[in-house]
Amino acid sequence: MHISPDDKRLQYCGRIDFDNPKAPVLVYAASFVQIRFTGTQISVTLENKRAYWSSRMGYILDGKQGQFLLTSDPGAETYVIARDLEHTEHTLTLFKRMDSCHIVTLLGFELGSDAKVLTPAPLPSRKIEVFGDSVSCGEVSEAVDYAGKPDPEHDGEYSNSWYSYAWMTARNLHAQLHDTSQGGIALLDKTGWFMDPDYLGIESCYDKIEYQPELSEVKPWDFSRYTPDVVIFAFGQNDNHPDDYMAEDYNSARSENWRQHYRRFLEHLMEVYPKATFILTTTILEHNENWDISIEEVCKTVNSPRVHHFLYSQNGKGTPGHIRIPEAEQMSKELTLSLIHI
């Protein structure tokens, strides 16, 4: 039994490209589609486009997590997720583990001939959006033996958005999540690590649904499709590349320019989301404190009850590598407590 992606019994969450409802494109980490069904088997047909790293999709089937490797070959491929299940009710959440190092087109699910698709569980009413970098995507999060250490060599196999502090926090608060984050990205173009050697910044990507020109046509995002209650800014760490001008001179013209752009970006999104609360932060990834001091300065300058600056207990000094699962759990605990009291 084929289940088309536009079947109303499927539940989606994330900034997803639905220009073709029968072939939606998952771009951002933590984007997912959920299906409730009866039957003994389930497969999914996907088309993967890869820019770098090996591509893996994640899933939660009846509460148990798994993953599978995607082919880099062009065209559609069908992947068996489960066989020989008990003939009872099942819930599958298929999610994007990684950022736009690849994009995935969903072409449908395949169930057994005697299966039934059930009404989806409703999404939570509370909504969160995170504009961040690789930490917010859960990059290299599964390399738990390297907690507090530099990253091991890898090809993307340790990256899992399920274990990002962002998705953990959303689950803690029973909230939807749009994890509008990208590994390596900085605020400004020509800085950071994303899209080497020209480097695209958040200012060029935040209002796009597809923004990776190596993989697809760049498309604008319709902000009316998702209105968050809480918006988290979690960037300012990749901005020190190719040179850490903020650490070198807090009062330089470049440093002041960054603060001005950060403020303009914040004030713009405050207009786009006029009722949202904004949390300005970075992470525990090692970086110079002048970036956080700059964010505090912007927060004080904007001087709005809707805007809060948040620092983790190990902010900027927790680890030289990416955040591993236990570190993300601690970050999520601290951030969740902060959001509960706002």
What residue spans do the PLM features occupy?
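Conserved small/polar residues in nucleotide/adenosyl-binding loops
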Residues: 340-342
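A structural motif corresponding to the C-terminal end of an alpha-helix
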Residues: 165-176, 265-277, 301-304
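Conserved SGNH/GDSL esterase-like catalytic core that processes O-acyl groups on lipids
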Residues: 28-30, 151-251, 259, 285-292, ...
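Generic structural signal for well-ordered alpha-helices
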Residues: 262-266, 296
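Short loop/turn segments at strand-loop or loop-helix junctions that form parts
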Residues: 131-134, 140, 182, 233-238, ...
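N-terminal secretory targeting modules
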Residues: 1-161
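Structural recognition of the beta-strand scaffold that forms the well-ordered cores
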Residues: 129-130, 177-180, 229-234, 278-281, ...
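Substrate-gating cap/lid alpha-helix
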Residues: 276-334
